[in-house]
């Protein structure tokens, strides 16, 4: 992509309305623009990151055997009345009437609707297990939306729902999805800790939250110090990770620790995922029954699994930034490479830049080629801000000798590379 053709409205000044780093950087780098309190337009750069995260999550759900569906944003209120949850959300749930005076709502979650879909289409234990997921925009009318997309009113979620014949099978499915979540966060390039948590209004009696460690996190989590090795050793077996202690603040009890208090550390975390074993709460309330192997009608066992796709964008930034801007993990970066031509009027610079651009594009490496008239200092600031993992810098002096500079955004290390070796080094 040529920067001269791209829509990248970067801000030089720090936006006064932003309180946390991720919100400031998302506005400054031209990823989002606010349309109303807690509601944002995703501009091209931000949308690329959002789609990259969405695709990685989708891939891991598919690997876990979940099947993608797409439920509507707008839901009939009678389903929520039937499940007994209509009044639980209060003013957070946006309700309205259509022209026929039917009460509708903008769904904050989908347990009620997926249970309705299940009960009308699955009747026998032979059709189990089933695991359905969708990726859809949600709305909760927060009293005080803040921190940009971290706590907005409109947000993108991946929600999955599993259905099993009994508790034993439901817990097996839950554990499979736990592993899928660990793998998804690994693939996203983030350090997420699974902690024992409350189920909240969703219901149930088994629950884990997944937290990214960040100083701006709103939750305090307590966890075994072993988790710190996950940062440098992401390939540790999931079964081993499951044996390590970690708990949300409301579940942390010093006198009931399975390990010594000295082995525990605490941090602020941003919740980016939550999984629940719900049991038969919804199936009983909504009469979602199936015939078991003895021909007896029995309520289905359910679990619910959520990942905040749009929140993850902000959380990843909070954990991967410096004073210059964002440092994207390669897996979610909008562009893997920023190609910076420092002098677009120098024929050798143009020759090397266009050669590199073609080679990168031919290898399907997403590259943003800065072919603008901007001054070198401005170009450096822009590309440090948007956070491409690698920068190829082409200036007249070194270009004359077929040399370009390759900068690693995270470490800041710059090395001279002969242009013919560029692809192999990358």
From Swiss-Prot:
UniProt keyword annotation of Aminoacyl-tRNA synthetase present: yes
EC supergroup of this enzyme: ligase
Upper classification of the organism: Bacteria, Pseudomonadati, Pseudomonadota, Alphaproteobacteria, Rickettsiales
Catalytic activity entry: tRNA(Pro) + L-proline + ATP = L-prolyl-tRNA(Pro) + AMP + diphosphate
UniProt keyword annotation of Protein biosynthesis present: yes
Species this protein is from: Rickettsia rickettsii (strain Sheila Smith)
Compartment(s): Cytoplasm
Keywords: Aminoacyl-tRNA synthetase, ATP-binding, Cytoplasm, Ligase, Nucleotide-binding, Protein biosynthesis
Quaternary structure (record): Homodimer.
Principal cellular location given in the protein's record: cytoplasm
Summary of the function given for this chain in its UniProt record: Catalyzes the attachment of proline to tRNA(Pro) in a two-step reaction: proline is first activated by ATP to form Pro-AMP and then transferred to the acceptor end of tRNA(Pro).
Similarity remark: Belongs to the class-II aminoacyl-tRNA synthetase family. ProS type 2 subfamily.
Database matches in Gene3D superfamilies: Anticodon-binding domain (3.40.50.800), Bira Bifunctional Protein, Domain 2 (3.30.930.10)
Name of the molecule in the record: Proline--tRNA ligase
UniProt EC number: 6.1.1.15
Pfam (any one): tRNA-synt_2b
Molecular function GO terms recorded: ATP binding; proline-tRNA ligase activity
Gene Ontology cellular-component terms listed: cytosol
GO biological process, alphabetically ordered: prolyl-tRNA aminoacylation
